[in-house]
Design a protein with these regions (language model features):
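Residue-identity detector for glutamine
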Residues: 9, 43, 58, 127, ...
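Serine/threonine-rich low-complexity intrinsically disordered regions
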Residues: 2-4, 84, 152
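Short, aliphatic-rich beta-strand segments
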Residues: 147-164
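Acidic/His-rich, divalent-metal-binding segments that scaffold phosphate/diphosphate chemistry
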Residues: 1-71, 76-79
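Histidine/acidic-rich helix-loop-helix segments that form or flank divalent-metal centers
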Residues: 82-142, 146-147
């Protein structure tokens, strides 16, 4: 099976896993990781690679990794749906390496995922109602009214523009 972002996005099991995961994170007071965040990260990861001139296959893999970036079970789910081993490994490896404390960009897909995830900065991602208990993610997101990513292929730069 070729990578197909639309099929992944419409997959009921994947959608339920994302939403249930967000319910748990919300109960623990963590920043929002709903389907909305997944869709934003997916769109941005694909846009990064597209604007930098990568091939459609890598763009699609980045979009899938962006959408599923909170799904610990991504590899098994993708293999179960018939995705080729090479693609399932690229996606699950990117997901496993996107955490800011332990992760590192090992290929264009993982680099795009890291940038896309960290640039979804907006006040309505904060789920913790108690400002005194905000963690660093809550404080950054709460301060931002809007964020835009500016990708300049000619200058080989990516910038984030925040409206506070």
């Amino acid at each position: 099976m070729k990578p197909d972002f639309k099929a992944i996005q419409e997959d009921k099991e994947i959608s339920l896993l994302i939403e249930k995961g967000n319910e748990v994170l919300k109960a623990l007071g963590y920043t929002e990781h709903s389907r909305r965040h997944a869709a934003k990260v997916s769109q941005t990861a694909g846009e990064i690679l597209e604007k930098l001139g990568y091939k459609d296959k890598q763009i699609e893999l980045a979009r899938i990794a962006g959408y599923m970036h909170g799904a610990i079970l991504a590899y098994g789910i993708l293999k179960e749906r018939g995705m080729a081993l090479e693609y399932a490994l690229t996606i699950s490896t990117a997901i496993g390496h996107h955490d800011e404390k332990t992760g590192t960009a090992i290929d264009p897909v993982s680099a795009a995922l890291i940038l896309a995830d960290k640039t979804d900065v907006r006040r309505n991602r904060v789920q913790n109602p108690n400002q005194a208990q905000f963690d660093i993610h809550d404080r950054v997101n709460y301060a931002a009214l809007k964020s835009d990513l500016i990708i300049d292929r000619e200058k080989n730069t990516i910038q984030i523009k925040l409206e506070l």
